[in-house]
């Protein structure tokens, strides 16, 4: 009876289709002047507030590479083996960097002919402009540098040691923490195109080349780590084996871990966050936790040490948690409640799910989210790993929820634990479907960011932070929602 008696005072839950942002006087003269930079977590900064969802039909290494190059980040799904997920992390890290970890090397006793072969002089893919000359391939002590120009007039039998520029006349560095800007300044002042980075015993650790720096500086939107590599996140669960997975992912180079379960406000998730924050193998990266939908959940995860929060219980296009479990909070209200607590502690929030348009991104961020996580909107792109099918004569890609039957059966198959219990115990909270093939990911991101820039300017703001201070919402009726879209025409 107490529950019945409380019905008149039940809180009201709103989602993106229930509201609009009220336009305000804007000082913005060009959308290009709008700043879309934000934080993913306490220490991870992004150029655009878009995160690729950790779904096995949305984000693997190809999606993550494009996301980082465009200023966002991809979170690699965990529905694979530890080795497979770590391999994806390494692929992202190798995709773009100003620190070459495995530069081509040659011995001083090699001939010009051998050097030409190593340099790939014919210009085939994989060719390099210089070789690092080392005393042997084990100790890797640098003896000098051999460039293509050193070989032009040499005879085929000439030895590398007679042609190379000795290390005593080579610009080198022992600063393994050197930044992109510092490396560029060294090249400018010393007039060199290569900088070998050496260890305490003169051993070759890395190589920085002018061509790699030019590639990186040509794309200023990319989100990079301190070594100039693309940033990437990885999802983990809360089981015992996920402690091993987390350590392996950090070792492989993951910049952030996302503890990702359907009900993030649980002791399992809270305990996992605490364990990761005290484990020396994992506490050097930020930990994001979710999914949650209440202020109480936000506070508990922040108290556990979470560096970021993932908000959303049931709003996704392939999620049926609200139907199966009867639980959830409409997404706009969930974001507002969680963000109100998170802002007090300086912890960024991700609005995960329910986003159908660029306008929804604007509403989520105005409500307090620092980033939005997209699944459906990015599925179907060329980079997305979903399988391509032909449906009614049109190409489509599969998309599926990670709490669904198919995703969990595939995971069990990979882990070689597919037995009758897996089928009997599984209660799906996700479905499978298809989305049209959409082409490359980058143009889609540009359209979404363009819409966000417009939304920020309509709020009379220059940045996300300013928008969150100034934004005002108005509730609208069903008729208002219908009026908001195209109407009274036949679409072409």
Curated annotation (Swiss-Prot):
Keywords: CBS domain, Glycosome, GMP biosynthesis, Metal-binding, NAD, NADP, Oxidoreductase, Peroxisome, Potassium, Purine biosynthesis, Purine metabolism, Repeat
Transport among keywords: no
UniProt-annotated binding residues for K(+): 314, 316, 319, 322
EC number: 1.7.1.7
Catalytic activity, as annotated: IMP + NH4(+) + NADP(+) = GMP + NADPH + 2 H(+)
Segments passing through the bilayer: none
Activity regulation, free text: Activated by GTP and inhibited by XMP and the IMP analogs allopurinol nucleotide and thiopurinol nucleotide.
Binding site for GMP: 352-354, 375-376, 401-403
GO CC aspect terms: glycosome; GMP reductase complex
Major place of residence: other
Pfam family, one: CBS
GO-annotated biological processes: GMP biosynthetic process; GTP biosynthetic process; purine nucleobase metabolic process
Motif (Microbody targeting signal): 490-492
GO molecular function: GMP reductase activity; IMP dehydrogenase activity; metal ion binding
Domain called CBS: residue spans: 99-162, 164-223
Subcellular location: Glycosome
Top-level class of the enzyme under EC nomenclature: oxidoreductase
Residues annotated as binding NADP(+): 30-31, 78, 260-262, 313-314, 402, 454-457
Protein's UniProt keywords contain Oxidoreductase: yes
Family affiliation: Belongs to the IMPDH/GMPR family. GuaC type 1 subfamily.
NCBIfam families: IMP_dehydrog (TIGR01302)
Self-association and partners: Homotetramer.
Stated role: Catalyzes the irreversible NADPH-dependent deamination of GMP to IMP. It functions in the conversion of nucleobase, nucleoside and nucleotide derivatives of G to A nucleotides, and in maintaining the intracellular balance of A and G nucleotides.
Protein name listed in UniProt: GMP reductase
Native source organism of the sequence: Leishmania donovani
Taxonomic lineage: Eukaryota, Discoba, Euglenozoa, Kinetoplastea, Metakinetoplastina
């Amino acid at each position: 009876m107490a529950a019945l008696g409380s019905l008149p005072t039940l809180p009201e839950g709103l989602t993106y289709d229930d509201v609009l942002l009220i336009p305000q006087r804007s000082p913005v003269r060009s959308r290009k002047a709008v700043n879309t930079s934000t934080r993913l977590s306490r220490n991870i900064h992004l150029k655009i507030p878009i995160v690729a969802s950790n779904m096995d039909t949305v984000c693997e290494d190809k999606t993550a590479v494009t996301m980082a190059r465009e200023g966002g980040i991809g979170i690699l799904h965990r529905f694979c083996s530890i080795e497979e997920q770590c391999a994806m992390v390494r692929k992202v890290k190798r995709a773009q960097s100003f620190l070459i970890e495995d530069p081509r090397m040659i011995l001083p006793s090699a001939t010009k002919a051998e050097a030409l072969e190593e340099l790939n002089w014919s210009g085939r893919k994989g060719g390099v402009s210089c070789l690092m000359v080392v005393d042997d391939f084990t100790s890797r002590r640098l003896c000098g540098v051999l460039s293509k120009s050193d070989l032009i007039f040499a005879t085929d039998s000439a030895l590398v040691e007679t042609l190379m520029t000795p290390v005593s006349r080579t610009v080198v560095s022992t600063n393994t923490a050197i930044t992109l800007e510092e490396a560029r300044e060294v090249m400018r002042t010393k007039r060199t195109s290569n900088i070998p980075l050496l260890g305490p015993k003169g051993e070759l650790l890395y190589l920085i080349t002018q061509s790699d720096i030019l590639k990186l500086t040509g794309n200023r939107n990319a989100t990079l780590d301190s070594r100039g590599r693309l940033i990437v996140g990885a999802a983990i669960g809360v089981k015992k084996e996920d402690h091993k997975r987390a350590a392996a992912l950090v070792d492989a180079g993951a910049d952030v871990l996302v503890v990702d379960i359907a009900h993030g406000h649980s002791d399992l998730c809270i305990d996992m966050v605490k364990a990761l924050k005290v484990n020396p193998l994992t506490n050097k990266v930020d930990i994001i936790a979710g999914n949650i939908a209440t202020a109480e959940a936000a506070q508990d995860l922040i108290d556990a040490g979470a560096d970021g929060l993932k908000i959303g219980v049931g709003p996704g296009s392939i999620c049926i948690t609200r139907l199966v479990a009867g639980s959830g909070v409409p997404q706009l209200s969930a974001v507002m409640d969680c963000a109100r607590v998170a802002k007090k502690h300086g912890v960024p929030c991700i609005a995960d799910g329910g986003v159908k348009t660029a306008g929804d991104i604007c509403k989520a961020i105005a409500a307090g989210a620092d980033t939005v996580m997209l699944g459906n909107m990015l599925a179907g792109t060329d980079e997305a790993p979903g399988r391509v099918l032909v449906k009614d004569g049109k190409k489509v890609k599969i998309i599926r929820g990670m709490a669904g039957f198919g995703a969990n059966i595939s995971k069990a198959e990979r882990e070689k634990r597919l037995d009758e219990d897996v089928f009997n115990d599984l209660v799906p909270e996700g479905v499978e479907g298809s989305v049209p093939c959409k082409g490359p990911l980058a143009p889609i991101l540009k359209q979404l960011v363009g819409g966000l820039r417009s939304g920020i300017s309509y709020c009379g703001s220059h940045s996300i932070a300013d928008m969150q201070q100034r934004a005002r919402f108005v509730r609208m009726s069903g008729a208002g929602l219908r009026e908001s879209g195209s109407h009274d025409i036949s679409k072409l």
